[in-house]
From Swiss-Prot:
Lineage of source species: Eukaryota, Viridiplantae, Streptophyta, Embryophyta, Tracheophyta
Modified residues (Cysteine methyl ester): 512
Protein name per Swiss-Prot or TrEMBL: Heavy metal-associated isoprenylated plant protein 41
Species of the source: Arabidopsis thaliana (Mouse-ear cress)
GO MF term (any one): rRNA (uridine-N3-)-methyltransferase activity
UniProt entry tagged with the keyword NADP: no
Keyword Nucleotidyltransferase among record annotations: no
This protein's encoding gene: HIPP41
């Protein structure tokens, strides 16, 4: 009864019994790593009344375990009877490669008092390094075996030299964040005996002293921040090693399966530097050239000429986008989604590598002869729109994007057709996927030119002819039962194998037969 008093019983509405032992529930899938005589897992299983949710593992084989520890055989027998999964020869640093663990996910992964072995004094830097390598390997493997909201628990001593292991720093390198640190009390787990596990006194307990249980949880935000940090470091290294090759490097080609709207086409312009210098911006064979020209007699018609850079360089052409990325963060996109524009002073500093920070940014309209009505687009997006509400929402999102002139639904209510120019397709697709449903790009092409209205064949007043009964009622022929005069060739009726009825009729010049 004393053991039962230590557990908390929670009964849900279905009558099933959930047993809590400190931080662990009978409904949790629990993995225990580095078990000595399996007394900790035996304690949990006894309090739960079942071990079907427990997977207990040890580094030693079964024969070594029962030879080292006196109570190991009885503990293993009890765990097996209660339904536990017992694994031997499991390396704590390669959990995610173990064939019995790599495809399983757990709510709690527990490692009590990790230790790399007694190979000297605990204060030796070499031994501390071995301990840290062991714990880091465990964190790396355990973080890959967690369920959503799963936790990694490590019980550890608080005082030096054990505090020099710095568990929080090791966990952060595996994108695990500390969510709680609670005192470890051995009395909460009746029957648990901590063992030295190595040497002649392997079955003897060691002094615990002041200990804590560190609870860690996987953080996707930490992983994304680390990836961004690595990318920025690589960009800085590339800039420092090859400062001149960044602007003149050939853009990387990608097979997008559709034509990008933001390629280097017809990009040309001038930027005035004072009164005599001009920076000429031009495009040739995929390269973007910056040329300084010195002249005295220059007709400077404006101090700010609309020069722009393509914003999709950041996502489509990584190798030359390192400058553009900085440029994009400092200079927010204007109302034209496919371009970034800036004042002359800002752009010159940026191009010449002297850019630090510019407080005033002037937004300019792009005004090149190469970009006009000839850049209209027709975009077809395939969407899984199941109801009318999702259709309306998709059309509302698309119509609000800059550059979109018309939006329509075609096909079996699964194709969103857009007409316009300068549409930011990547941003639109991303927003539709997030707010409506899965979206796939089918085609991106130039919109066909608008045809002038054709005069109706019925004449100036477009009069409706009188209704007439005709014989052109062939399925899928495009004619209706009471057809109007259409500029089509004479229709050939396939003769019937049966003898036709006697009909009196006359043929009209427009191809209809009047009964």
């Amino acid at each position: 009864m004393a053991m039962r008093e230590l557990s908390q019983l929670n009964r849900d509405s279905d009558g099933d019994e959930e047993v809590w032992v400190k931080h662990y529930s009978s409904n949790h899938q629990i993995l225990l790593v580095g078990e000595g005589d399996f007394s900790f897992s035996h304690s949990l299983a006894t309090l739960f009344g079942s071990a079907s949710n427990i997977c207990a593992s040890s580094l030693d084989s079964y024969d070594v375990v029962v030879r080292k520890y006196k109570k190991a055989r009885s503990n293993l027998k009890t765990l097996k009877r209660l339904g536990a999964l017992l694994l031997h020869g499991v390396d704590a640093t390669t959990l995610h490669f173990h064939p019995d663990l790599r495809y399983r996910r757990f709510d709690r992964v527990i490692f009590n008092f990790p230790h790399a072995g007694f190979h000297g004094r605990e204060s030796d830097s070499s031994l501390i390094r071995k301990h840290r390598e062991l714990v880091f390997g465990f964190f790396n493997g355990a973080s890959r075996l967690l369920r959503a909201n799963g936790e990694v628990h490590v019980s550890h001593k608080n005082k030096a030299p054990f505090s020099e292991w710095n568990l929080e720093e090791l966990a952060s390198r595996c994108f695990l964040v500390l969510i709680q640190r609670v005192a470890f009390e051995k009395n909460n787990y009746p029957g648990y005996e901590n063992k030295r596990g190595d040497g002649r006194r392997c079955d003897q307990p060691f002094l615990l002293g002041e200990c804590s249980t560190f609870k860690f949880r996987f953080s996707r935000v930490a992983k994304e921040l680390y990836a961004e940090k690595v990318r920025s470091r690589e960009v800085k290294e590339r800039e420092s090693m090859y400062p001149e090759a960044i602007l003149n490097k050939q853009p990387v080609s990608f097979d997008h399966r559709y034509r990008l709207q933001t390629e280097f086409e017809a990009i040309a312009g001038t930027i005035t530097l004072g009164k005599s210098k001009i920076l000429w911006l031009s495009q040739e064979k995929g390269h973007l050239h910056w040329i300084f020209v010195t002249t005295k007699n220059v007709d400077v018609y404006s101090s700010k000429i609309p020069v722009f850079l393509i914003c999709t360089l950041e996502s489509r052409q990584r190798d030359i986008a390192c400058f553009v990325k900085t440029f994009q963060f400092k200079l927010v996109k204007n109302h034209y989604p496919n371009t970034l524009t800036a004042g002359v002073e800002f752009l010159v500093k940026f191009i010449t590598g002297k850019y630090e920070e510019c407080q005033q940014v002037t937004y300019l309209r792009k005004n090149f002869s190469g970009y006009g009505d000839g850049n209209k687009q027709r975009i077809v997006l395939k969407m899984d729109m199941s109801d009318e509400k999702s259709m309306k929402k998709a059309m509302k999102i698309a119509s609000a994007k800059p550059g979109v002139r018309s939006v329509s639904i075609q096909g079996q209510n699964d194709q969103l057709v857009l007409l316009g120019e300068g549409i930011d397709l990547a941003e639109l697709t991303r927003e539709l996927k997030k707010k409506v449903c899965m979206t796939t790009i089918i085609t991106v092409q130039a919109a066909p030119p608008q045809q002038p209205p054709q005069p109706h064949p019925m004449g100036q007043y477009n009069q409706m002819p009188p209704a007439r009964r005709c014989t052109c009622e062939i399925p899928n022929s495009g004619f209706c039962g009471f057809c109007r005069s259409m500029s089509q060739p004479n229709y050939q009726v396939v003769p019937s194998p049966y003898y036709p009825p006697m009909l009196y009729c006359r043929d009209e010049t427009d191809g209809c037969r009047i009964l």
